[in-house]
Design a protein with these regions (language model features):
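Acidic, glycine/proline-rich Ca2+-coordinating loop motifs
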Residues: 1-186
Length: 186
């Protein structure tokens, strides 16, 4: 009965990916943002558990759903038809503009000034230089104890790619839910 809320962010699952796509603020910048009412901003998905009294508890880390990388198209539905809501998160971006190597070496001020002063820009070459790293989707199966288990590979959704949307419904009218996931450049 009570609706829960799941929101996605872009916290990578691996520490390596976190270090290669995230630019961390130094202490002074962090404090300036807090003082400027930007509050404390941290990358992570949020799973808001409805407490039934007009309040919610954030349980994403407890539930094992906090980190799903570049996330789009999250759905909450009974994926495995066991009566418990599961979570699907579609992932991937074809050209990863958050890659810090790209930002530091290709999209830096020196190259921007060169493009402006010389007036030359090879857009195709520039796009080809941006990293393209396919990642798998996440299919979190409800474990019935406020936690979820990623079963994407077991359910045929673990192939790395660039998915950015999904929908579900009983498309063939057989009484169970069907899933459609769209992929880019596959």
């Amino acid at each position: 009965g009570r609706p829960d809320i799941f929101t996605t962010e872009m916290l990578p699952e691996s520490d390596y990916k976190l270090k290669t796509v995230t630019k961390f603020d130094d202490y002074d910048v962090f404090n300036a943002k807090v003082k400027g009412d930007f509050y404390y901003q941290y990358l992570q998905n949020a799973l808001h558990l409805n407490n039934g009294d007009n309040t919610f508890s954030e349980i994403a880390f407890l539930a094992n759903v906090a980190a799903t990388d570049w996330s789009w198209g999250a759905l909450i539905f009974d994926f495995d038809n066991d009566g418990w809501k599961d979570i699907l998160v579609c992932n991937g971006i074809y050209k990863d503009l958050t890659n810090q190597d790209f930002i530091d070496f290709l999209a830096n001020d020196k190259n921007r000034i060169r493009v402006i002063t010389e007036g030359k820009f090879n857009f195709k070459e520039f796009l080809d230089s941006i990293a393209s790293n396919p990642i798998p989707n996440y299919a979190f199966i409800n474990q019935k104890n406020l936690s979820f288990l990623n079963q994407s590979y077991q359910l045929g959704l673990g192939m790395p790619g660039f998915s950015n949307g999904a929908a579900y419904g009983d498309l063939d009218n057989d009484g169970d839910l069907d899933l459609v996931v769209n992929n880019v450049n596959m």
